[in-house]
């Protein structure tokens, strides 16, 4: 491809596209740049494997620390496994791309986005999403594009397209909208309890900007004479399709209308129909029968056509009758139950949330500031994270046996969504300095486990005594669209997710939305349908919230006795070195002496943690005494540390030592210092003078008995 360089003026910033310059052996590549952030996106296609019945699409987002002029840490000094942020961006690219590939496509497709340069203003993620569309089109891969993405922020009453990191931080909305010529294909958002109407307006605002980027891609395609390839789907074997439909349709309808069946019973009956009415019937046919010939030539065609028939009949039942496979109305939520304090209080907070056959156990743990997740080797400006949400999806939750692996992209993505939903209602760090981790264990899955983990986490946090500002609930919305007929489903279960067109997760409080995530299986939705789905989610969320509040309506007043007790104090940042000591000797001594854990921030904030409040208070007193300013005339109890000919040195506070001249040891003449004090003696002294160099001159003379008594009882203020 010839080199092509084009700048697009986009909402006050330039987006620069360079094609044909880098990665010439990739199927298609583009260097997309805004500000000093530049991302190389490549798309490569290879012949698919024989016999597969899915699209083998792989999307990877890669970060290199050289992009920010940094060298990785660790012994190897090179990047290791992708950080969580990179995995989430990989998903962000994948989700709007996947529904735009033809359903019949079976070629291997690999898309790699690599951030080559990054500034402190422009996030690379939405650039990578738009760049992926350009790379796919340049590679002549069948694709219902173009597709583009923008970020929408909200500062005050004004929406902003592609806000900077700083604008995202201070704003009330972080929304990514991706769209195609057919409409919105993906939404991802975190919000500060925004009303539904504000979210709808933001998505509409973002999609208008997406349309401009789609047109810009069309201009590039025209300039380079790159056609948009769609391709032709393979012909359906009508003989086999008719045989399956004739044999199984009525039986499938009967199963779909048995509303009392649970997921497993329904699946068993559908499998039995396939086995008896289709597989066994084909096996009994003569070898030369066209149906048997077709089934032999395409072994997976029977399963795929049976699945398509089941999908068609379920969707028809919803469109025509307005009834779902479990008998619910379109806007009805499944039965809900929840419990808290399910486990002993060694687990700081626990909650079990169930919605239908979906069951999630959420467990909250309170930690110290030192437990925060360090993001130092991440390209993004966030240094650490004080709220962590981890989501686990074991195979037994769907009745399967599989090897256990480290968390996959789905688990990481669902955990991040729940984390985003909860973060806006957490107390400020100044009021509640704990680091909080919630783990959601999916014990049974039949749809909407991510929103189940949001609900369970809210209850677990309240059970742990975290003073959240408001409880959060969530619901997953679905869609069945056949031509102009549209049905939006509330609280979708597994089969509706699998056979439907949309999975739209909405989480929030009774005041507004805190998180959104919409994924499509069709090529786009109108804003009218998007708005209706968001509005229909509101009564469902509030209903779920009411059910949760019946279990636990407010956070517990007391923490678990096994949660650490935290105390905070401020010291002069210049005194941090004094508290830490050479090689950490001083702070290590304090922790060993008091049985506490101490964290010191760069601004001088000291956080002390211990299982017993008394131990934390003791450590606080020691640090207070070490760092407090001494004044002339103050009286202290100190310890004699050494003796010289002209006097004795006394440690009045940890790390603060002064000298009592021999003339100040006692009334009258003192012959030898040893006649009055010995090393290790505890003595009451007064600060007589602090000289220009900060040295303390002490005395034992002129101390009132009340002052001496107070010094013996002195403690650090709380």
From Swiss-Prot:
GO cellular component assignments: cytosol
BP GO terms, sorted: mRNA catabolic process; RNA processing
Domain S1 motif: 633-701
CDD domains given in the database record: KH-I_PNPase (cd02393), RNase_PH_PNPase_1 (cd11363), RNase_PH_PNPase_2 (cd11364), S1_PNPase (cd04472)
Keyword terms of this UniProt record: Cytoplasm, Magnesium, Metal-binding, Nucleotidyltransferase, RNA-binding, Transferase
UniProt-listed Enzyme Commission number(s): 2.7.7.8
Entry GO MF terms: 3'-5'-RNA exonuclease activity; magnesium ion binding; polyribonucleotide nucleotidyltransferase activity; RNA binding
Cell location: Cytoplasm
EC top class named in words: transferase
List of residues binding Mg(2+): 497, 503
Required co-factors: Mg(2+)
UniProt superkingdom: Bacteria
Main location: cytoplasm
Residues in KH domain copies: 564-623
Reactions performed catalytically: RNA(n+1) + phosphate = RNA(n) + a ribonucleoside 5'-diphosphate
Function: Involved in mRNA degradation. Catalyzes the phosphorolysis of single-stranded polyribonucleotides processively in the 3'- to 5'-direction.
Record-stated family: Belongs to the polyribonucleotide nucleotidyltransferase family.
Protein name as it appears in the record: Polyribonucleotide nucleotidyltransferase
Organism whose genome encodes this protein: Rippkaea orientalis (strain PCC 8801 / RF-1)
Source organism phylogeny: Bacteria, Bacillati, Cyanobacteriota, Cyanophyceae, Oscillatoriophycideae
Gene field: pnp
